[in-house]
Amino acid sequence: RICYNHQSTTPATTKSCGENSCYKKTWSDHRGTIIERGCGCPKVKRGVHLHCCQSDKCNN
């Protein structure tokens, strides 16, 4: 699986992953809205929006 693994507004980067899914996490703090992307489908804390998907580059 090829997943995006950049954060928020940094230039897009991808990673070849062993997992079959990609994720995109979104949350807000004093810096504003933070977006994190990566491989797999992690558990998240309350208040964090999580989107998991199972195709290449699906987590942009």
Curated annotation (Swiss-Prot):
Q: List the disulfide bonds.
A: C3-C22, C17-C39, C41-C52, C53-C58
**One GO CC term of this entry?**
extracellular region
Give the UniProt keywords, A-Z: Acetylcholine receptor inhibiting toxin, Disulfide bond, Ion channel impairing toxin, Neurotoxin, Postsynaptic neurotoxin, Secreted, Toxin
Q: In which tissues is it expressed?
A: Expressed by the venom gland.
CDD domains given in the database record: TFP_snake_toxin
Keyword Aminoacyl-tRNA synthetase found? no
According to its UniProt record, where is this protein located?
Answer: Secreted
Q: Name one GO molecular function term.
A: ion channel regulator activity
Its main localization is secreted
Presence of the UniProt keyword Disulfide bond in the record: yes
Its annotated function is as follows:
Binds to muscle nicotinic acetylcholine receptor (nAChR) and inhibit acetylcholine from binding to the receptor, thereby impairing neuromuscular transmission.
Which family does the similarity line name?
Belongs to the three-finger toxin family. Short-chain subfamily. Type I alpha-neurotoxin sub-subfamily.
**What is this protein called in UniProt?**
Short neurotoxin 1
Q: Which organism is it from?
A: Dendroaspis viridis
Taxonomic lineage is:
Eukaryota, Metazoa, Chordata, Craniata, Vertebrata
